């Protein structure tokens, strides 16, 4: 007997297989780029959220803490990895900021002046304030990262004569963030490690002296992962340090709201980048799976007619954080995906069950209905 139900089921399976095959053509690099993009947007959105809700002074304090924490975690270890330890300190610091930022997708130029003085100039568009975001960020952010990172290089290198001189900033409408590392001929007081000299201009750019990472070691895949990790680190550290400034409750409230808004806003863009569809439960699961795979985590799908469970193992976003920090970051970050699935034409509910929180085998079961 001819069965319409059987034909519909067969067509459903065929359609599902077709969608899965289409998504399978998307490369790992596509997934990694999608994750880098949405985490970059989340950090930008979080900055605007705090700037508009909490004001310039909170922003300055927060950014100081973000960059000091990143400096203490990354500077010396990355300094050695980039092979800069043999260079004079001013030269090494300038090259470090060019290399580390270029690896993260940020354009920075290097202009050596002497063994004791070397310039860096950040080129537009600025990653930190991409797009129109630059118009909503107060100058206190610039002062926060200058004091949090640039003015601390000499301390980390145990060179009391090394300081940073800023000649141009982004929010002042000059020619963008620019300045130089200089080893003075005297020990600097704490308030002298960072200074300003707006009347100075950098030397001309010379392409032949720009530092670069070894191409054999830094493949395209490794660079894409570094770009993703760069954005994710700003989100992780941003949320952890924000709690130090405005407290846990407000951080969770504003961090979650920013995440949900970015998820809502960026679903279509990231879905299209992954060749996905704005369709049924299976489409929602394929989208979420592809995005989470872009983090380098292991992901699988269990589904029935009424719901789908996406299982994520590894949870890179909370890796190496303390138990309290892990919970804070996850509680905010999960709303990226809650917002994304709410943005579908048929709105999908997403519930996260976070297991083994304090272990390397941390697992999340994402229930989609």
Name each model-derived stretch.
Residues 1-119, 126-144, 155-176, 182-369:
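N-terminal accessory segment detector
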């Amino acid at each position: 007997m001819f069965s319409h139900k059987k034909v519909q089921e067969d067509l459903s399976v065929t359609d599902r297989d077709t969608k899965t095959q289409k998504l399978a053509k998307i490369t790992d690099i596509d997934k990694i780029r999608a994750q880098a993009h949405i985490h970059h947007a989340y950090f930008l959105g979080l900055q605007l959220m705090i700037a508009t809700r909490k004001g310039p002074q909170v922003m300055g304090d927060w950014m100081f803490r973000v960059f000091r924490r990143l400096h203490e975690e990354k500077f010396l270890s990355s300094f050695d990895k980039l092979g800069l330890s043999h260079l004079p300190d001013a030269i090494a610091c300038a090259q470090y900021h060019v290399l580390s930022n270029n690896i993260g997708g940020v354009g920075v130029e290097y202009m050596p002046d002497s063994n004791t003085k070397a310039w860096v100039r950040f080129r537009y568009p600025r990653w930190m304030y991409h797009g129109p975001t630059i118009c909503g960020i107060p100058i206190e952010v610039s002062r926060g990262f200058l004091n949090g990172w640039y003015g601390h290089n000499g301390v980390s290198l145990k060179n009391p004569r090394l300081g940073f001189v800023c000649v141009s900033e982004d929010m002042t409408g000059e020619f963008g963030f620019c300045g130089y590392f200089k080893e003075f001929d005297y020990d600097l007081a704490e308030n002298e490690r960072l200074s300003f000299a707006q009347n100075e201009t950098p030397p001309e750019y010379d392409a032949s002296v720009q530092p670069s990472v070894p191409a054999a070691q830094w493949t395209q895949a490794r660079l894409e992962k570094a770009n993703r990790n760069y954005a994710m680190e700003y989100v992780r550290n941003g949320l952890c340090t924000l709690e130090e400034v405005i407290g846990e409750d407000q951080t969770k409230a504003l961090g979650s709201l920013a995440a949900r808004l970015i998820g809502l806003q960026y679903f279509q863009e990231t879905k299209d980048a992954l060749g996905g569809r704005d369709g049924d439960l299976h489409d929602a699961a394929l989208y979420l799976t592809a995005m989470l795979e872009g983090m380098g985590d292991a992901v699988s799908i269990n589904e029935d007619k009424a719901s789908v469970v996406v299982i994520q193992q590894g949870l890179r976003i909370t890796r190496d954080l303390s138990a309290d920090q892990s919970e804070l970051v996850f509680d905010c970050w999960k709303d990226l995906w809650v917002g994304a699935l709410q943005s579908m034409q048929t709105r999908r509910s997403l519930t996260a069950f976070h297991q083994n929180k304090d272990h390397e085998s941390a697992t999340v079961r994402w229930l989609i209905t």
